[in-house]
A protein has these predicted regions:
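N-terminal binding-site loop/beta-alpha segment at the start of enzyme catalytic domains
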Residues: 1-49, 86, 115
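Beta-hairpin (beta-strand-turn-beta-strand) motif
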Residues: 21, 53-55, 96
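Solvent-exposed, flexible loop/coil residues
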Residues: 26, 53, 104
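Hydrophobic/aromatic residues located in beta-strands of well-ordered beta-sheets
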Residues: 47-50, 120-122
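Extended hydrophobic secondary-structure segments that form protein cores and membrane-embedded regions
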Residues: 49-53, 92
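Glycine/proline-rich, positively charged
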Residues: 57-127
Length: 127
């Protein structure tokens, strides 16, 4: 993965797209990219566009997937931890929940994950 990141960056690719469930083990792509970023690319952080997604299963339990407020906030918190960052440039909703009207999924994902504010500030949000 390190060689791929270096080659990409050397050829002008600055958008790195991840998700909470990518990797052979959920979260491992973010974890590995976070280590590479910390060790080799942190000086270039302002040149990078880092995105992550949430939506599919990541942990067991009633809030381990889909678009609940609890899931989206927890997932973004965990992605930031794995990446070693305090913000990502883009965070989006990765899955569709058939029982949830699409306008609610889109609205929640947009509000909860696309705002450029501290994740802790989102805890006051009630849909």
């Amino acid at each position: 993965m390190k060689k791929l990141c270096f080659t990409s960056f050397d050829h002008g690719i600055t958008h790195f797209d991840l998700a909470n469930n990518y990797g052979p083990e959920p979260g491992s792509a973010e974890k590995h990219f976070g280590l590479i970023l910390k060790e080799h690319f942190f000086a270039y952080r302002n040149e990078l566009l880092i995105s992550t997604k949430a939506g599919y299963d990541i942990w067991k339990g009633p809030y381990g997937n889909w678009g609940s407020r609890k899931y989206l906030i927890a997932s973004l918190d965990q992605s930031l931890q794995r990446l070693g960052l305090d913000y990502v440039d883009i965070s989006s909703f990765h899955a569709e929940k058939k029982s949830l009207p699409s306008y609610l999924s889109i609205g929640r994902a947009f509000f909860v994950c696309s705002c450029i504010i501290n994740v802790q500030d989102l805890r006051i949000y009630t849909p």
